[in-house]
């Protein structure tokens, strides 16, 4: 029977000093012997997805105390990718994931906590905390801040629902006036919460549900809705129940590595492919799998992508569907239900809230249950009032979206596409693979062939696009933006948004060893591995080389023969210390922190985790 980890600092005569310090935090005699449960919050006023989290840790703490535990809250950092986008701030986004993982590990292990509740929400915070949870392998529950409401605007005589990507596209188009752009900007992000489409933050929060590490509705119920309060309170109660099962009954099925098994990772990736989630999820799931010592690789993702259909399309893949609509259709439990009916997931996996995923679906899938509380929960609707307050409204839809033929979530028979929403491409340009979000690609360009336009920074590519130097049929190739080459593997939301604003979104492609925001769409191929700075073939592409992309056949090739490629590689190697570096002089300050990240990071094909 495992002992409480916290006993090492709360019991024994030699720990009198430690107990004295615990008492100074508010602990009483009766508290020594209770489980100490860490609450990792990520409140910050910099990020709309986290601005409302300040007091929510105490909601969890109250329930932990009532259930017989001792709650201790701490905070970690959170970077807003949207605010960091388009300048050197984006270099820090992906590296912050490792710092978040480390900070959670440091706090939990330094203070010998017995269990963990992770309050996350946005892009790198959920993955960082997930990595930490799998390292620590103590009872853990995730509860996120929830998605933002979609913006609503009457714009150019149209009633639209919008998000931040719409504001970016509007601003880049010369056809919109300053007043029109300002109007769109003010409407795009009306409330607290993670951005309203199926971007990285919401994708990852949905995937914690699929992994079994968070409660039903975690990925979809709005940040503003009072129903989300129930998730925080239940997380506090449930974590104590998990603690008792592990420490008092020796039940290892409640541990993160038991819950997030290989089968659970396959389930999560299946959900991601079926809903056309962010390509960043590939990076983060690979990283988390390595932390949990789970044998889950790009090869597995490739196999899944060939058999999983697209059952759900959300902005930016389609303009009029946001997370509030996914929730009305049953959320991730509804999507898992359809995948289960199609025989595409394994429901024997464990969860933090039910013994198995099958048991969870029996209760929470709106197509399988008539439970009034469940049906009411999934009718939670937006309030339509700008706010930064959590749980500030209680609006409900009159009906659920149960239409699996034409609704937001489809069954396999009525899938948007029988081919998955994400694909792994291989070829002489990406020997270790690259990723494309096929759910956001127009059917007319699933195969594409064109000349490469070479750029060695995101900035130079953006300048070329905005100055009309990119023409129909060309492939914008941005290199030396990978984990090591950037360093930090910047997101390329601005180049993709500007291509769309210039009317090139369906007639051009973008290929990079960097990555894309969950808000990106179009023929955007990222994570090219090996990256340029690692000696990848992408560094050897020359201006005008023809690149052939074939998504149905999962291939990406540059039409250059092997003899020529060997000559180019030899020429590059002859540069000595100057090899595998951008020729273009980049105006980029690389700090010691970023240099340290670059020195230790691995390829995107391995999740860009550190090689230690």
Swiss-Prot record:
It catalyses: (2R)-2,3-dihydroxy-3-methylbutanoate = 3-methyl-2-oxobutanoate + H2O; (2R,3R)-2,3-dihydroxy-3-methylpentanoate = (S)-3-methyl-2-oxopentanoate + H2O. Its EC number is 4.2.1.9. GO terms for cellular component: cytosol. Pfam families: ILV_EDD_C (PF24877), ILVD_EDD_N (PF00920). Keywords: 2Fe-2S, Amino-acid biosynthesis, Branched-chain amino acid biosynthesis, Iron, Iron-sulfur, Lyase, Magnesium, Metal-binding. Belongs to the IlvD/Edd family. The active site is at residue 517. The keyword Metal-binding applies. GO terms for molecular function: 2 iron, 2 sulfur cluster binding; dihydroxy-acid dehydratase activity; magnesium ion binding. The modification N6-carboxylysine is found at residue 124. Functions in the biosynthesis of branched-chain amino acids. Catalyzes the dehydration of (2R,3R)-2,3-dihydroxy-3-methylpentanoate (2,3-dihydroxy-3-methylvalerate) into 2-oxo-3-methylpentanoate (2-oxo-3-methylvalerate) and of (2R)-2,3-dihydroxy-3-methylbutanoate (2,3-dihydroxyisovalerate) into 2-oxo-3-methylbutanoate (2-oxoisovalerate), the penultimate precursor to L-isoleucine and L-valine, respectively. NCBIfam families: ilvD, PRK12448.1. [2Fe-2S] cluster binds at residues 122, 195. This is Dihydroxy-acid dehydratase. Pathway: Amino-acid biosynthesis; L-isoleucine biosynthesis; L-isoleucine from 2-oxobutanoate: step 3/4; Amino-acid biosynthesis; L-valine biosynthesis; L-valine from pyruvate: step 3/4. Binds 1 [2Fe-2S] cluster per subunit. This cluster acts as a Lewis acid cofactor. Signal peptide: none annotated. Disulfide bonds: none annotated. Homodimer. The lineage of its organism: Bacteria, Pseudomonadati, Pseudomonadota, Alphaproteobacteria, Hyphomicrobiales. It is an enzyme of class 4 (lyase). It comes from the Bacteria. InterPro entries: Dihydro-acid_dehy_C, DihydroxyA_deHydtase, DiOHA_6PGluconate_deHydtase_CS, ILV_EDD_C, ILV_EDD_N, IlvD/EDD_N. It comes from Bartonella tribocorum (strain CIP 105476 / IBS 506). Mg(2+) binds at residues 81, 123-124, 491. The keyword Hydrolase does not apply.
